[in-house]
Amino acid sequence: MTQIHPTALVDPKAELAADVSVGPFSIVGPNVRIGSGTRIGSHTTVEGHTTIGAGNNIGPYASVGGVPQDMKYRNEPTRLEIGDRNTIREFTTIHTGTVQDRGLTSIGNDNWIMAYVHIAHDCMVGNHTVFSSNAQIAGHVEVGDWAILGGMSGVHQFVRIGAHAMLGGASALVQDVPPFVIAASDKSGNKATPHGINVEGLRRRGFDAGQIAALRQAYKLLYKSDLSFDEARTEISALLAQVDAGTAAPLQAFVDFLAATQRGIVR
């Protein structure tokens, strides 16, 4: 049975599964769909053309599905889609997309989004990510599966963060982070720079020694050699041709990510 607190305002046109709960003083708009078992905390707003899947837990004072902070926005019916089993903590803001992009902001499954996080318009967030408190991503950012963003980190618009990458706390990121790479600020300032392969994270997620060794070799070619970016890509592609099929999959993801960069990679 749906549990709606007497002080909550749920529009009659909203579609809520039978066991959704909505806390005190929360607002759910007319174009919202919420799946089974999702819990909306107190003083939370869910608005816009927003679809939320099953088993999510959205904390108090969150703002989900608000209009984009984009001066080009003209009240177009753009969307926000959130998958299943996500935790979205207090004071988080997540905005719908814009027609200048896909018209969609999307968040996958099993993500852990801590307090005061901002996910802007047209962002694409994968599965199993962690956004530490106060992490802020600008419009059109892509965050791959299992990526981790440290607290108070900031990400420039259109930047991509690859799968299994890690961004250190209080870091400013203005270019792409390849998959499996750690980027963090150093003593010279808060601009994120590369700091090696996320070895510990990969071990925890079941990557074997051969896969990790191949990624380390690719990292050295990209960051620790005198090769240009294009030369490094060529050498990494040659390395890919030499490894067995089991080792090749993460290395292929690394190569594909480099080939698709538009803003360049973190240096």
Swiss-Prot record:
Cellular component annotations (GO), alphabetically ordered: cytoplasm; membrane
Pathway: Glycolipid biosynthesis; lipid IV(A) biosynthesis; lipid IV(A) from (3R)-3-hydroxytetradecanoyl-[acyl-carrier-protein] and UDP-N-acetyl-alpha-D-glucosamine: step 1/6
GO molecular function annotation: acyl-[acyl-carrier-protein]-UDP-N-acetylglucosamine O-acyltransferase activity
Keyword flag Cell division: no
Primary residence: cytoplasm
GO terms (BP aspect): lipid A biosynthetic process
Catalyzed reaction equations: a (3R)-hydroxyacyl-[ACP] + UDP-N-acetyl-alpha-D-glucosamine = a UDP-3-O-[(3R)-3-hydroxyacyl]-N-acetyl-alpha-D-glucosamine + holo-[ACP]
Subcellular locations according to the entry: Cytoplasm
UniProt keyword list: Acyltransferase, Cytoplasm, Lipid A biosynthesis, Lipid biosynthesis, Lipid metabolism, Repeat, Transferase
UniProt EC number: 2.3.1.129
Subunit structure: Homotrimer.
Role this protein plays: Involved in the biosynthesis of lipid A, a phosphorylated glycolipid that anchors the lipopolysaccharide to the outer membrane of the cell.
Family affiliation: Belongs to the transferase hexapeptide repeat family. LpxA subfamily.
UniProt protein name: Acyl-[acyl-carrier-protein]--UDP-N-acetylglucosamine O-acyltransferase
Record gene name: lpxA
